[in-house]
Amino acid sequence: MSLKPSWGARLKTICLVGGKLQGFEAAYLSKKAGMNVIVVDKNPQALIRNYADEFHCFDIIKEPEKLFELSKNADALLPVNENLECIEFLDSVRDKFSCPVLFDFEAYWISRDKKKSKQYFASIGVPTPQDKPLEPPYFVKPPCESSSVGARIIYDEKEIRDLEPGMLIEEYVEGEVVSLEVIGDGKNFAVVKETLVHIDGTYDCHMVTPLPLDPDFRKISYALAANLSLKGIMDVEAISGPKGLKIIEIDARFPSQTPTAVYYSSGINLIELLFRAFGEGVEEIEKLPENKYCIYEHLMLRENGSLIPVGEQVLSMGTDYGKYYKEPGIEIFLCKGEKPVFTLVFWGKDREEAGERKRKGLSILKENFGAAV
C-alpha cells in the first residue's frame, strides 16, 4: 500500500500503538518532522499520554474497529511496543488498515527470537559470540525481546546450573556496545549512523553518543537487512573490542534512545526515512547530511541532590514524560515518578561545543532543582 496522495500537501499524521519509551522516541521525531501524533495505549496512565497530540485509551485486541477507524485519518501506523500478543494481533489484521503499517513483521519474528537470530547470523557468515563456550566467563541473556533484564556475566560454572530455563549462554566478549540502524524498502537499504551505547551494571543504556563511520559494521548491517529483504527498520547491536566486531543482536522495531542521537549527529530523521521506505523508497546513504556531535543521557535526581546515570528500566517506571526545557543545542525532558529522571540532549558542531552545552544544561538543573553538579 502506498502513502496517500495528499502526503506533503497537509500536516501528516502518524498513529503510534504504544505509549512507553519506544513511543516517546517515535513521537519526538515525528514532531520534529512536523507531524501530528496520535498515541494508542490500553493503559490510561501511559507514560507519554500528555506528550501526544491525541491520546486514545483502549485495548486494540478487544476493540480493533477503533484502531481501523483511526487509521482512516492517519498517513501511517507504527507499532512501538514489545507486547507479543499486540504485535501478533496487528500482524493478523494488517490488511484491514487504511494506511501503511511501518513494520516488517517477518523480520521482527526472527529478531525477537535470539536463537533464530543466531542461526540467521551463522547462515550468512556474520561474526557473533560463540554459543555455550567450554569455560567461563559466560554472558547470559534472555531468549526473547530486546530487554536487558536478566543479562549478566557469569564467572562460576556452578551458577550455570541455576539459570532460568531457556536463557542463552554465550562467550563473554570484552568491548564497547555499538549500534547501527538500517531502514529498507525491501530492495534498497539505508545504513544510517553508528552510535556508542553506554551501559550500566545491569546492561541497561544510560547514554548514547555518535561514533565515526565503521565500514565493517556498515557492511555487516547492510547484509543483515538485505538478506531479510527488510521493509521497515532494524537496529543492529555489536560488541567492538580486541576480537573485532561481534554482532550480539538485531531488533526489527523502532528503537528508543539511539534515534535522537542519530538525528542530531547525522541530520537524518529515522521516522521520515521510515515513511519513505513505504512510499517513494529509500536511497542507500553514500554520505550523511551532517557530521555533528550529540550527547543523549538519562540522569536521576536523588534526595541529596546528586544526579546518577540510570537506564530505561528506571525511566519506564515513571508516571508522566514530557518537555521541560529547550534552547538551541539543549533539550531537557522530565520523567516524573518516585524520583525525577531527566533525559538530557545536547548537540553542537563538535564534542567540545556539545560538552559546553551539557555544562549549561546541568547548571539549569542546579538552579531549578538544587542538583549537585
Tell me what each language-model feature is.
Residues M1-D104, E283, W347-D350, R357-V373:
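ATP-binding N-terminal substructure of ATP-dependent carboxylate-amine bond-forming enzymes
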Residues L16, N36-D41, L77-P79, T128-D131, ...:
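Short, hydrophobic beta-strand segments that form beta-sheet elements in well-ordered domains
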Residues N50-D59, C99-P100, Y138-V140, M167-I169, ...:
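Active-site regions of enzymes building and remodeling cell-envelope glycoconjugates
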Residues Y108-V177, G184-F189, T195-D200, C205-A223, ...:
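Active-site nucleotide/adenylate-binding loops and adjacent lid/helix of ATP-dependent enzymes
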Residues E171-S229, S240, D251-F278, K287-N291, ...:
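ATP-dependent carboxylate/phosphate-activation module, predominantly the ATP-grasp catalytic core
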Residues L230-V236:
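Active-site-adjacent "lid" and substrate-binding segments of diverse enzymatic cores
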Residues G244-K246:
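Conserved protein kinase catalytic/activation segment
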Residues F275-V373:
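Peripheral (often C-terminal) accessory segments that flank ATP-dependent C-N-forming ligase machineries
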